């Protein structure tokens, strides 16, 4: 099973890339974590936000591999603690499909992305900066994997 983070935004600061890569390289070969960056639409004073969201959503959905489980990252989604995320990860592995996790831009996700989702996950009730979300996601998924693999990374 491959896990793919599909995120709106490119040209992240170096610390974001380094943080994400630190956790990405820890994943086992049979569960690679990859990042697909979707260019953000140009936003300005007179920007058509609905149109920008639609375009970003189309690009995100076209990046999802055929047959992959789609999980949206959205505040109203399910709130999983670490053991629950580990259970989800195990269920995804047993399902046998790749997993694509969609991370929206400043205005969130397009309605089409939400409609296409198999699941919706709320990372936090807090509004987090999108660059930081990439690192938190990578670490959270790695920690969940470590629980399923009985790896000593996670401690209760």
Curated annotation (Swiss-Prot):
Per UniProt, subcellular location reads as:
Cytoplasm
GO CC terms: cytoplasm
- Class of enzymatic activity (EC top level): transferase
Disulfide bond annotation, renumbered to this chain? none
Q: Which UniProt keywords apply?
A: Cytoplasm, Methyltransferase, rRNA processing, S-adenosyl-L-methionine, Transferase
Q: In which residues is S-adenosyl-L-methionine bound?
A: 73, 104, 123-128
Q: Which InterPro entries match?
A: Alpha/beta_knot_MTases, RlmH-like, tRNA_m1G_MTases_N
Q: Name one GO molecular function term.
A: rRNA (pseudouridine-N3-)-methyltransferase activity
UniProt keyword Transferase, yes or no: yes
| Annotated Gene3D superfamilies | 3.40.1280.10
Check the record and name the Pfam families matching this protein.
SPOUT_MTase
Task: Report the EC number(s), separated by commas if there are several.
Answer: 2.1.1.177
Q: Which domain of life is it from?
A: Bacteria
Query: Which reactions does this protein catalyse?
Result: pseudouridine(1915) in 23S rRNA + S-adenosyl-L-methionine = N(3)-methylpseudouridine(1915) in 23S rRNA + S-adenosyl-L-homocysteine + H(+)
| Described purpose of this protein according to its UniProt entry | Specifically methylates the pseudouridine at position 1915 (m3Psi1915) in 23S rRNA.
Q: Which family does it belong to?
A: Belongs to the RNA methyltransferase RlmH family.
| Subunit annotation | Homodimer.
**Under what name is this protein listed?**
Ribosomal RNA large subunit methyltransferase H
Specify the species.
Answer: Vibrio campbellii (strain ATCC BAA-1116)
